[in-house]
C-alpha cells in the first residue's frame, strides 16, 4: 500500500505532492471518487460506500428533525390545525439585525410575534393528515428523528471497524439484498405505515385522540380482529366517512378503515385516508411476497443468473433469434459494477420523483393542501427539478460504467453489446425526432406570432390535441363528448364483468369531471404546442446523454476514447483531435438542455394553474399559442408584483423574493463568464491578481505555498455550469413563490 500523504488530499500521494493550486481543486473534485484513491481495493471500496450510506441517512434525519423542531418551537401549528385554510403556516422565526421597522412589520403576521418565514414545504399538511395535532407531537417526532440520526451515525462508524466490516461476497449477494430490500425495506415499511394510518391517523381524523398513552388499548375498528381471522374482510370497508365528514371531528365520520372509494373527500379536497391505508396495505403484501421469491441459502426460489441466461426468445417466436445471446452475462456485469447499479437506481428514482410532482397535485394526498396554491406550485417545481438532476446523473454513471467497468468479452453479442453495435441507428433516430419536433413546433409558434403581430389572429394554426383528449375521455372525462370507454356508461369498460359489481372506484368519475379539480385538466391548442416543445426538450436532452454514453468508449473520430477516461475537454483539433467530445462534455451539454426543458415544464404547469386558481382560464388558452404570449402574459405579467417587493416608496413582504430574484439572475449571469472565457484568459487574470497581491502592503503579509494556476478547461466549465444551475433555480424559485403568493394573498 502507498504511504499516506502528509497534506491534503491524503488519498492521493500524487496530488498531495503537486506544487500548484491544482492540488486543492483536483483534491476536492476527486474526494468522492473512491475508486481512484491510493491503495483502494474492491472490498474497501464497497465497505466505504456502505458506511457513507449510513452517514447520508443520518444527515437526512438530522435535517428532517430540524424542520420539525423549528415548526414546533417557532411555528403556529396548533393555531393552524384549528383553521387550516385561514392561517398561513410558519416555517420558523427570522432574526436579522439589519431589518428596519418596515421589514419587521412586513414579515410579522397578524397577531404579532415578530418576523417569520412562511412555510411552503407542505409539512403542516402532512403532519395534519397523519394524525399529529399538537406541538408536543412535533417535539416527540423531532427527538425521535434525532435519535434515529444518532443510531445511523453509530452504524456507519461500526461498519468501518475491522470486526464489523462486511466481506466482498456479502456485498455481491444480489438475491439476498433484493429480498431484503423488497420485503424488509419496502414491504415492512409499507405495512408499518398502513398500521400508523389505521391506528393513529384515521381515528384522529374522526376526532378520537390516539397517542403513546392509549394506542395499544384503542381499537381502530369496532369489530376488532374478528373479521380478519374469519376472512370476512369486507367488514373493514363498510360504513366509510360520508361526504359531509368534518375533518378532525366525529361529525359525518364512519367506521371503515380500508376502503376502495376513489376520488376525494369534498371537505379536505384530498384522497380518502381509508383509501390510502388500503393502498399501503396492498403494497406491503405484494412486496413482502416479492421479497421471498429469490434463491438464497435454502435452495428454493428464483436464481437471477438463471433467469437472465434463459431470457432469450427461441427462434420462431416473436423477437426469436433477434436478441443474440439475450441477457446472458448481464448478471455479473451489473453485479460487478457499482456505476451500473447507481445508474439504474438514479433512473428509477428520477422517474418516481417526476411522478410524485405530477401526482402530488393531481391526486393530492394531504388534507387542505390543494387550497394552498403557493405550496402546490413550490412542490411541483421542486420535484420536477430534482427528477431532472437524477435522470442526468443516471446517464452520467451509465457512461462511467462503459468507460471503467464494461467488459466486451463477458458481454459478447448480448443485448448490451448489441445496443453498442447499433448505436448509430439509435442516435440518428433520436436526432431526426429532435429536428422534426424542434422545427415544426417552433414553426407553428413563430407563424402564430406573425399572425398576431400582423393583426390577423384568426389565421393562427391551432391544432386540437385529439389523441390526448381521447385518452382523457377513455378515462371518464365527459367534457369532450367523445363517449368512449369510461365516459360512456354503455361501453364495455363500464359494463363488462365484474364492473356491475362496482369494481371501478365509485368516486373516480365524479373526481375526473369536477370543474374545480386537477385531474385531467381540459386541454386545447396551447397545450398541444407546449407539449411538443417539452417533447423537443426531452428528446434533445436524451439524444445528448445517449450519444455521450454510447460513444463513451470510442467513436469514428476517436476510437481510443476510453483510454482518455470519462472526462477530457473538447478543445478543438489543435490538441490532438478531442473534437469528438468526452462523456463528461455530453453530460455538461445535457445539463443546460435539462434545465431549459424543466423550465418549459414548470412554466406550463404554473401558468395553466394560475388561470384555474384565479378563475381566468381564457388567458392561458388564448395567449399560450404564440411566443409573445408566454413572454408577456406569463413571465412579464407575473413578475410585476415580484419586482415591486422593494422600490423608492418602501418594501413589502415580497421584498426577500424580489432580492432573491435579482440575486439569482446575478449568479446565473456569472456562470457565463466561466463558460465563455477559455484557459489562457484565466491564467493571465490569476497571474495579474497574484502580482498585485504580492506588491500590496498588508495583503502581502499573507502568502500561500501553492503556485496559483488557472482552472483546467473542464473545471472552468464545471464552475460555469454550477453558477448557471444555481442561479437558474434560485431565480425561478423566487418567481414561482412570489407570483403565486401575491395572487393568493
From Swiss-Prot:
Class of enzymatic activity (EC top level): oxidoreductase
Function of the protein: PsaA and PsaB bind P700, the primary electron donor of photosystem I (PSI), as well as the electron acceptors A0, A1 and FX. PSI is a plastocyanin/cytochrome c6-ferredoxin oxidoreductase, converting photonic excitation into a charge separation, which transfers an electron from the donor P700 chlorophyll pair to the spectroscopically characterized acceptors A0, A1, FX, FA and FB in turn. Oxidized P700 is reduced on the lumenal side of the thylakoid membrane by plastocyanin or cytochrome c6.
Family in the record: Belongs to the PsaA/PsaB family.
A Pfam family matched in the record: PsaA_PsaB
Reaction catalyzed: reduced [plastocyanin] + hnu + oxidized [2Fe-2S]-[ferredoxin] = oxidized [plastocyanin] + reduced [2Fe-2S]-[ferredoxin]
Name assigned to this protein: Photosystem I P700 chlorophyll a apoprotein A2
Lineage summary: Bacteria, Bacillati, Cyanobacteriota, Cyanophyceae, Synechococcales
Chain residues that bind [4Fe-4S] cluster: 570, 579
Residues given in the record as chlorophyll a B1 binding sites: 665
Signal peptide, first to last residue: none
Entry binding sites for chlorophyll a B3: 673, 681
EC number: 1.97.1.12
Details of cofactor binding: PSI electron transfer chain: 5 chlorophyll a, 1 chlorophyll a', 2 phylloquinones and 3 4Fe-4S clusters. PSI core antenna: 90 chlorophyll a, 22 carotenoids, 3 phospholipids and 1 galactolipid. P700 is a chlorophyll a/chlorophyll a' dimer, A0 is one or more chlorophyll a, A1 is one or both phylloquinones and FX is a shared 4Fe-4S iron-sulfur center.
Domain of life from the UniProt record: Bacteria
Membrane topology, record value: Multi-pass membrane protein
Record's subcellular location: Cellular thylakoid membrane
Subunit text: The PsaA/B heterodimer binds the P700 chlorophyll special pair and subsequent electron acceptors. PSI consists of a core antenna complex that captures photons, and an electron transfer chain that converts photonic excitation into a charge separation. The cyanobacterial PSI reaction center is composed of one copy each of PsaA,B,C,D,E,F,I,J,K,L,M and X, and forms trimeric complexes.
An annotated Gene Ontology molecular function: oxidoreductase activity
UniProt entry keywords in alphabetical sequence: 4Fe-4S, Chlorophyll, Chromophore, Electron transport, Iron, Iron-sulfur, Magnesium, Membrane, Metal-binding, Oxidoreductase, Photosynthesis, Photosystem I, Thylakoid, Transmembrane, Transmembrane helix, Transport
Organism: Synechococcus sp. (strain JA-3-3Ab)
One GO cellular component term: plasma membrane-derived thylakoid membrane
GO annotation terms (biological process): photosynthesis
Amino acid at each position: 500500500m502507498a504511504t499516506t500523504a502528509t497534506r491534503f488530499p491524503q488519498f492521493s500521494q500524487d496530488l498531495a505532492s503537486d506544487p500548484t493550486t491544482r492540488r486543492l481543486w483536483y483534491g476536492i473534485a476527486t474526494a468522492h471518487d473512491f475508486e481512484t484513491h491510493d491503495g483502494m481495493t474492491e472490498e474497501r471500496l464497497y465497505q466505504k460506500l456502505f458506511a457513507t450510506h449510513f452517514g447520508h441517512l443520518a444527515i437526512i434525519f438530522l435535517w428532517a428533525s430540524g424542520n420539525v423542531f423549528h415548526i414546533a418551537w417557532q411555528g403556529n401549528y396548533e393555531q393552524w390545525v384549528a383553521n387550516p385554510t385561514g392561517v398561513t403556516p410558519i416555517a420558523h422565526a427570522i432574526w436579522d439585525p439589519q431589518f428596519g421597522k418596515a421589514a419587521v412589520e412586513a414579515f410579522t403576521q397578524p397577531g404579532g410575534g415578530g418576523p417569520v418565514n412562511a412555510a411552503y414545504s407542505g409539512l403542516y399538511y402532512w403532519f395534519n393528515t397523519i394524525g399529529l395535532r399538537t406541538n408536543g407531537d412535533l417535539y416527540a417526532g423531532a427527538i425521535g428523528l434525532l435519535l434515529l440520526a444518532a443510531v445511523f451515525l453509530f452504524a456507519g462508524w461500526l461498519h468501518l471497524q475491522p470486526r464489523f466490516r462486511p466481506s466482498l461476497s456479502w456485498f455481491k449477494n444480489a438475491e439476498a439484498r433484493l429480498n431484503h430490500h423488497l420485503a424488509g425495506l419496502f414491504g415492512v415499511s409499507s405495512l408499518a405505515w398502513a398500521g400508523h394510518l389505521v391506528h393513529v391517523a384515521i381515528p384522529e381524523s374522526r376526532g378520537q385522540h390516539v397517542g403513546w398513552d392509549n394506542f395499544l388499548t384503542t381499537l381502530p375498528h369496532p369489530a376488532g380482529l374478528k373479521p380478519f381471522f374469519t376472512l370476512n374482510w369486507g367488514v373493514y370497508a363498510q360504513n366509510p366517512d360520508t361526504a359531509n365528514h368534518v375533518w378532525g371531528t366525529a361529525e359525518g365520520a364512519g367506521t371503515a378503515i380500508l376502503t376502495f372509494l376513489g376520488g376525494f373527500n369534498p371537505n379536505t379536497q384530498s384522497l380518502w385516508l381509508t383509501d390510502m391505508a388500503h393502498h399501503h396495505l396492498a403494497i406491503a403484501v405484494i412486496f413482502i411476497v416479492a421479497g421471498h421469491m429469490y434463491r438464497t441459502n435454502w435452495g428454493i426460489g428464483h436464481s437471477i443468473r438463471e433467469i437472465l441466461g434463459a431470457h432469450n426468445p427461441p427462434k420462431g417466436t416473436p423477437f426469436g433469434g433477434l436478441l443474440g445471446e439475450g441477457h446472458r452475462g448481464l448478471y455479473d456485469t451489473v453485479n460487478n459494477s457499482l456505476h451500473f447499479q447507481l445508474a439504474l437506481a438514479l433512473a428509477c428514482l428520477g422517474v418516481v420523483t417526476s411522478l410524485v410532482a405530477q401526482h402530488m397535485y393531481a391526486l393530492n394526498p394531504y388534507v387542505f393542501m390543494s387550497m394552498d396554491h403557493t405550496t402546490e406550485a413550490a412542490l411541483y417545481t421542486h420535484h420536477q427539478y430534482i427528477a431532472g438532476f437524477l435522470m442526468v446523473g443516471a446517464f452520467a454513471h451509465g457512461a462511467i460504467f462503459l468507460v471503467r467497468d464494461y467488459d466486451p468479452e463477458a458481454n459478447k453479442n448480448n443485448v448490451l453489446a448489441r445496443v453498442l453495435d447499433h448505436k448509430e441507428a439509435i442516435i440518428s433516430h433520436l436526432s431526426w425526432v429532435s429536428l422534426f419536433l424542434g422545427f415544426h413546433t417552433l414553426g407553428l409558434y413563430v407563424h402564430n406570432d406573425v399572425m398576431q403581430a400582423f393583426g390577423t389572429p384568426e389565421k393562427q394554426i391551432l391544432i386540437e390535441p385529439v389523441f390526448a383528449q381521447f385518452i382523457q375521455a377513455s378515462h371518464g372525462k365527459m367534457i369532450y363528448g367523445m363517449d368512449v370507454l369510461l365516459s360512456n356508461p354503455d361501453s364495455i369498460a363500464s359494463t363488462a364483468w365484474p364492473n356491475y359489481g362496482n369494481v371501478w372506484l365509485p368516486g373516480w368519475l365524479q373526481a375526473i369531471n369536477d370543474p374545480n379539480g386537477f385531474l385531467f385538466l381540459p386541454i386545447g391548442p396551447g397545450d398541444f404546442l407546449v407539449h411538443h416543445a417539452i417533447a423537443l426538450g426531452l428528446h434533445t436532452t436524451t439524444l445528448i446523454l445517449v450519444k455521450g454514453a454510447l460513444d463513451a468508449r470510442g467513436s469514428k473520430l476517436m476510437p481510443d476514447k476510453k483510454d482518455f477516461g470519462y472526462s477530457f475537454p473538447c478543445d478543438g483539433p489543435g490538441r490532438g483531435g478531442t473534437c469528438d467530445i468526452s462523456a463528461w462534455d455530453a453530460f455538461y451539454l445535457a445539463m443546460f438542455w435539462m434545465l431549459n426543458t424543466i423550465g418549459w415544464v414548470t412554466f406550463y404547469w404554473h401558468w395553466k394553474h394560475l388561470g384555474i386558481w384565479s378563475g381566468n382560464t381564457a388567458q392561458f388558452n388564448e395567449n399560450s399559442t404564440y411566443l409573445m404570449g408566454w413572454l408577456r402574459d406569463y413571465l412579464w405579467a407575473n413578475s410585476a408584483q415580484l419586482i415591486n417587493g422593494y422600490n423608492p416608496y418602501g418594501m413589502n413582504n415580497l421584498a426577500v423574493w424580489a432580492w432573491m430574484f435579482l440575486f439569482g439572475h446575478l449568479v446565473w449571469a456569472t456562470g457565463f463568464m466561466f463558460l465563455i472565457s477559455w484557459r489562457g484568459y484565466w491564467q493571465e487574470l490569476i497571474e495579474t491578481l497574484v502580482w498585485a497581491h504580492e506588491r500590496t502592503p498588508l495583503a502581502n503579509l499573507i502568502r500561500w505555498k501553492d503556485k496559483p494556476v488557472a482552472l483546467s478547461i473542464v473545471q472552468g466549465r464545471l464552475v460555469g455550469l454550477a453558477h448557471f444551475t444555481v442561479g437558474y433555480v434560485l431565480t425561478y424559485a423566487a418567481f414561482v413563490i412570489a407570483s403565486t403568493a401575491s395572487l393568493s394573498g
